Amino acid sequence: MREIVLKGIDEKIYYDVCDNGLPIYMLVNEKVNNFYMTLSVKYGSIDTEFKCKGESEYTRVHDGVAHFLEHVNFNEPDGSTAHEYFDKLGSSINAFTTFDFTCYEVFAYTEFEKNLNHLLDYVQTPYFTKELIEKEKGIICEEVKMGKNNPGHKLYYGMNKALYKKDKRRNLVTGEVEDVKGTTVKELQSVFDTFYHPENMFLVITGNFNPDVAVGIVKENQAKKTFSKYLAPVKKFDKEPMGVNEEYLEIEANVEIPKVKISYKMPMSLFSYDKRLLNIYLSIILRNNFGATSYLREELLEKELVVGIGANRDIFNDVVTIDINIETKYPSEVIPIVKEKMKNLVLNEDDLKRRIRCNIAALINDFDDIEYVNTDIADQLVTHGDIADNMYEIYSNLNINEANDIISKIDLSNSSTVLLVPFK
């Protein structure tokens, strides 16, 4: 076991790896009386085309298979479910699927060993029968239908369909109803066998526990299991072209106040910074111009033009996106104001220093939240493939010249606006 020392913030992450390739990341917090475990698989909803070594053709599975597999994986060979086992322990469990990965989680106060062993066991022991699959289809189809009636869901995927031409983020994580109905046991087994391998998974444990004991439990558990050789599947992604699918889209939804999402898409090659650093700078720039303490937000609220406004960014593959989210009764007035602001983003030296101090304070304080830090570790592993041990240094070295360089290179030529309006 080795330690990943997080420089400047007096924290460390313990790291080990099992003989079968399963990595273990642990952060101990003796100030709490609980623990949070997540077992993640680097397989998400966009991974619908893949091939393994020696294969000439890509395998294509239905959209939503990652999410479907997450659902049925709670079934146990004895006819029970993982929920029943953890309920008896007094533990809380859940799972979720994103575009990029699938995560199974356990939150508990006691019975550390039993919780850890069974998390590993139920996730790594598939039990798929035609009857269980057919039963689950009805449940997931209802989930799909409910999601499509959710205003936030409509706005998010409406924008994805407007902004992206080829990227699979256009598609629902759940898949459409037709995808769910068409999913087969063979597909689920194929995905499980290909991706649910220790070398393609990682375990993160945060909270109050003994890391040496945890590693011993995991290694003993994994030593009892036999896994076939990892086939290192290659995922197929279509290169996302510039330009947008639709510049303007209006969608009716169950809302009282219209919601707006203005999004911009640009190539990452515009920026001469790595993904992690670019993400930090964009976050600071957007918060300064559209965040809770921004002048624009205060002005729009004071004039009662908006109920709320905020911004976020995303970086994947070689694409950078920026989203401005607005809730307003006056979209025709507010949209031009926001677009004009995007042309005139500002960040001065004092703003940057203040936000650096805020980020460093958050970096330190966030380690008290075992769920947050667990999620952050997982996100770093999925997004960057490693854990940065120098975030304090990165924040400390941010400078106004680099920030303004990034502002100057933001390309607004590929933009979509999606407006969510009340049903007529």
Where does each model-flagged region fall?
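Conserved short hydrophobic interaction patches
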Residues: 122-125, 217-225, 341-345
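Short, low-order "capping/linker" segments at domain edges
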Residues: 145-149, 153, 243-257, 361-377, ...
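Acidic/histidine-enriched alpha-helical segments
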Residues: 56, 126-145, 210, 230-241, ...
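Active-site glycine-rich loop that binds ribose-phosphate moieties when present
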Residues: 180-191
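M16 family metallopeptidases and their MPP-like homologs
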Residues: 27, 32-48, 80-122, 156-178, ...
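Short, flexible, solvent-exposed loop/turn segments with mixed acidic/basic and small polar residues
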Residues: 92-96, 189-196, 311-316, 404-409
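Internal helix-turn-beta structural module
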Residues: 393-411
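His/Glu-rich zincin catalytic helix
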Residues: 1-81, 189-299, 415-424
